[in-house]
C-alpha cells in the first residue's frame, strides 16, 4: 500500500468508523464512534471502513452500520479474544497461517506481546515477522516442524509442541502482556 493509499484509507476511516464520546482524566472530551472490541485495531477499523463504504453504497441506514460495528464479535480463530487469565490477554489468531497475516496481527497487538509461532511451514520467508517485531516488546516462542527456522529468524525460543509453547507463555509472559497464537504455519504436525 502506498502513502497515498494510506491517506485515502485514513480519510475514509475518519468518515465512516464508529466512535463514541469519551471523557479523559483531564476533563477533555473525545467525540466520535468507537467499535466493539473485535474491531478495535488498525486492521479492524480498516475492515470496518471498507464494509461501511459498501453498506452505504447499498443504501444500508447509518443506524444499522453503527449497530453492526458495536455488535460484531469477530470470527472464530481470527484475532478472537479467548479471555484474560492471570493478568494476560489471550488471543487466538490461529487462522494466521501465513507471514502477511502474522505481520498484521503483530501490528495490531498491544505490547508486550508473546507470540506463539510454528507448525508446518509453507515455504515462506520469515524475515518480515522479525521486521515487524523490531523495536517492539515481542517475545517469540516457536514450535513444530518449522520451529527452528522461525526461532532463527525471530530470535525466539524453540520448543517442540504447541502445548509446550502455551505453558512457557503462561509462565513467562509479564503481567499485562498479550499472548498471541498466530502461527504463520499450518498445524498438521501438531495433531494426530
Which functions belong to the PLM regions below?
Residues 1-90, 151-152:
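Acidic, Mg2+-coordinating active-site environments of NTP-dependent enzymes
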Residues 75, 94-162, 186-192:
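Active-site beta-alpha connecting loops in nucleotide-dependent enzymes
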Residues 3, 180-184:
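Short beta-strands and strand-loop turn motifs
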Residues 165, 173-178:
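Glycine/Thr-rich phosphate-binding loops that ligate phosphate moieties of nucleotide
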Residues 130-131, 167-172:
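Short amphipathic alpha-helix with an adjacent loop that forms part of the alpha/beta core around
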Residues 18-20, 77, 85-87, 109-113, ...:
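Short coil/turn connectors at secondary-structure junctions
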Residues 85, 184-186:
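Short linear capping/connector segments at secondary-structure termini
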